A protein has these predicted regions:
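Mature-region segments of soluble proteins
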Residues: 4-5, 22, 41-166
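Zn2+-dependent metallopeptidase catalytic domains
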Residues: 34, 38-39
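C-terminal segment of N-terminal export signals and the immediately downstream linker at the start
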Residues: 1-22
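N-terminal secretory signal peptides
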Residues: 22-23, 29-30
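Residues at helix-coil transition
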Residues: 28-29, 96
Length: 166
């Protein structure tokens, strides 16, 4: 019931969701191995997480606003409306914390959160699990207890055990 309540609510605006989608696909683009973050449902995952974990709401909304303001100052348009070259130039300034200018620290903090949520959403999706090649728990082959250990304890397998169990 709690999950249904969260899914019924909307936190991000259409504009914010479009920006999140662009950012997620910059962070994890489609390649020859797997689909993009948006194809994996990352924007919907982020929408769900900020409703489930309200402490992310202000940093995410504030970060999206900060990003748009930076792009308006530089390019006279919102981040989502910039061309890919402009978007990447903006992201390059905040994606590497150790290289970022001090005045961009708010953007760095936002992008770190965005990157973490994107990676979490992607690698917990079906596309992401396939991307890393995770097959799940699989039984391995077991040849039984080694003969020297069995002898040490005065035990040996019966013909039935050998036939049915090993």
């Amino acid at each position: 019931e709690y999950e249904k309540k969260l899914e019924a609510e909307t936190f991000f605006t259409t504009h914010e969701m479009a920006t999140i989608t662009v950012l997620a696909d910059i962070i994890i683009p489609k390649d020859e191995v797997s689909g993009s973050a948006s194809e994996a449902g990352v924007p919907a995952f982020i929408e769900f997480i900020v409703k489930d974990m309200p402490q992310h709401q202000t940093p995410m909304r504030g970060g999206l606003k900060w990003l748009d303001l930076q792009c308006f100052e530089r390019y006279e348009k919102a981040f989502k409306d910039c061309d890919s070259k402009q978007q990447l130039a903006m992201i390059d300034e905040i994606a590497y914390p150790e290289k970022a200018k001090p005045e961009l620290k708010q953007g760095v903090a936002f992008f770190n959160l965005m990157r973490n949520l994107t990676a979490t959403g992607f690698y917990t999706s079906e596309i992401g699990v396939k991307d890393v090649g995770y097959l799940g728990n699989r039984p391995n082959q077991w040849a039984g207890v080694p003969d020297e250990v069995l002898k040490q304890y005065g035990y040996s397998y019966t013909e039935k055990e050998l036939k049915e169990c090993i």
